[in-house]
C-alpha cells in the first residue's frame, strides 16, 4: 500500500505540518490520527464543512456528492472523502471561500 506526504497549511489557523497518509485513508482521518483537528460535519462528502483546497499534488475525491465540476476545477476537495494519490499540499478551513 502506498503512502504519501500530505502537507496541511492555513496561516490563519497557524497550521503548517506534513503528515504521512496511506492511499486508503482519507485526508481528514489521517489528520485526526495525527492529532490535527480539522472542521467536519457529515463525514460522507455531502456537505462543505471539511472543504480544503488542493494547492499541489493529486487526490481522489470520487466519493463526494456536494462539489460541482467548477469548484473541483478550482482545487476544492471534501477532505472527509478525499484520498491522497501523490504527495500533496492542501489549504485547510476553506469553507468561507467556496462560494
Swiss-Prot record:
Tell me what this protein is called.
Ferredoxin, heterocyst
One Gene Ontology term of the molecular function aspect: 2 iron, 2 sulfur cluster binding
Q: How is the cofactor bound?
A: Binds 1 [2Fe-2S] cluster.
Q: Does the keyword Cell cycle apply?
A: no
Family to which this protein belongs: Belongs to the 2Fe2S plant-type ferredoxin family.
Record's SUPFAM superfamilies? 2Fe-2S ferredoxin-like
Q: Does the keyword Metal-binding apply?
A: yes
Function (record text): Ferredoxins are iron-sulfur proteins that transfer electrons in a wide variety of metabolic reactions. Donates electrons to the nitrogenase.
Instruction: Give the gene that encodes this protein.
Output: fdxH
Cofactor(s) listed: [2Fe-2S] cluster
Per UniProt, residues of the 2Fe-2S ferredoxin-type domain are 4-96
Q: Gene3D superfamilies attached here?
A: 3.10.20.30
Q: Which UniProt keywords apply?
A: 2Fe-2S, Electron transport, Heterocyst, Iron, Iron-sulfur, Metal-binding, Nitrogen fixation, Transport
Origin organism is Nostoc sp. (strain PCC 7120 / SAG 25.82 / UTEX 2576)
Q: Which PROSITE patterns match?
A: 2FE2S_FER_1, 2FE2S_FER_2
Q: Where does [2Fe-2S] cluster bind?
A: 42, 47, 50, 80
What other note does the entry give for this protein? This ferredoxin is expressed by heterocysts and differs from the ferredoxin expressed in vegetative cells.
Q: Which residues form a coiled coil?
A: none
Known CDD domains for this protein?
fer2
Pfam families with a match to the protein in the record: Fer2
One BP term from GO = nitrogen fixation
The superkingdom listed in its UniProt entry is Bacteria
Amino acid at each position: 500500500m502506498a503512502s504519501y506526504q500530505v502537507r496541511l497549511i492555513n496561516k490563519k489557523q497557524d497550521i503548517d505540518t506534513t503528515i504521512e497518509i496511506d492511499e486508503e485513508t482519507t485526508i481528514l482521518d489521517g489528520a485526526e490520527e495525527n492529532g490535527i483537528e480539522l472542521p467536519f460535519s457529515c463525514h460522507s462528502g455531502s456537505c462543505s464543512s471539511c472543504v480544503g483546497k488542493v494547492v499541489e499534488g493529486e487526490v481522489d475525491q470520487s466519493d463526494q456528492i456536494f462539489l460541482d465540476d467548477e469548484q473541483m476545477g478550482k482545487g476544492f476537495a471534501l477532505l472527509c472523502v478525499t484520498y491522497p494519490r501523490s504527495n500533496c499540499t492542501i489549504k485547510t478551513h476553506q469553507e468561507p471561500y467556496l462560494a
